[in-house]
């Protein structure tokens, strides 16, 4: 089921906040009011996951400059996130909140639960300030994601929101031309 253009479902969960070195409660309301990225991954203390989360951290300042809140989610507890943060060179760099979803509520809400394994799939969601999903990417376990591509998708989503009636073509980058769909473009692209 596609979540594109659908509002996120309610949830309440515990997260580890590395910036403050504390546990905190988060809900769907924390993903509203500004742009948000939710990055699901299978498990702490694993292999591809730390490379993805470190890559996401490497883009964190750019995401903050774009006004984007970043959250990672796995079916581990927030306690395990803290332990991983304290023991992994890659994960110790993370500044964004790490949500624990042992009940699998959020993972199910975003339709990324691998039922057989009981783990989250590799899913990334861009959520607008209204709490509506604007983009989604889901990869197989062995395929890591590229956070620089994510940054460009966010820029495109923000551009389209700020410029109604315009769309971003393939390979669009900030500053390049957008399209205005209409009869004058039919068959000319």
UniProtKB/Swiss-Prot annotation:
The active site is at residue 49. One of its GO terms (biological process) is cellular response to stress. One of its GO terms (molecular function) is NADH-dependent peroxiredoxin activity. SUPFAM superfamilies: Thioredoxin-like. Residues 2-159 form the Thioredoxin domain. The keyword Transferase does not apply. CDD domains: PRX_Typ2cys (cd03015). It is found in: Cytoplasm. Keywords: Antioxidant, Cytoplasm, Disulfide bond, Oxidoreductase, Peroxidase, Redox-active center. Pfam families: 1-cysPrx_C, AhpC-TSA. Its main location: cytoplasm. It comes from the Bacteria. It is an enzyme of class 1 (oxidoreductase). PANTHER family: ALKYL HYDROPEROXIDE REDUCTASE C, THIOREDOXIN PEROXIDASE. Homodimer; disulfide-linked, upon oxidation. 5 homodimers assemble to form a ring-like decamer. Thiol-specific peroxidase that catalyzes the reduction of hydrogen peroxide and organic hydroperoxides to water and alcohols, respectively. Plays a role in cell protection against oxidative stress by detoxifying peroxides. This is Alkyl hydroperoxide reductase C. The gene is ahpC.
């Amino acid at each position: 089921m596609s979540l594109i253009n659908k509002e996120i479902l309610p949830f309440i969960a515990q997260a580890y906040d590395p910036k403050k070195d504390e546990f905190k409660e988060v809900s769907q309301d924390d993903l509203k009011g500004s742009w948000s990225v939710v990055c699901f991954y299978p498990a702490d203390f694993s292999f591809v996951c730390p490379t993805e989360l470190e890559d996401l951290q490497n883009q964190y300042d750019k995401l903050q400059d774009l006004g984007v809140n970043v959250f990672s989610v796995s079916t581990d507890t927030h306690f395990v996130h803290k332990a991983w943060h304290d023991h992994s060179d890659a994960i110790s760099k993370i500044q964004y909140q790490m949500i624990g979803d042992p009940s699998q509520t959020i993972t199910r809400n975003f339709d990324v639960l691998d039922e057989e394994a009981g783990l989250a799939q590799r899913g990334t969601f861009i959520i607008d300030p209204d709490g509506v999903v604007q983009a989604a990417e889901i990869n197989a376990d062995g395929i890591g994601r590229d956070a620089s591509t994510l940054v460009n998708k966010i820029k495109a989503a923000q551009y389209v929101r700020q410029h109604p009636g315009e769309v971003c073509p393939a390979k669009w980058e900030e500053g390049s031309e957008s399209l205005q769909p209409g009869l004058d473009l039919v068959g000319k692209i």
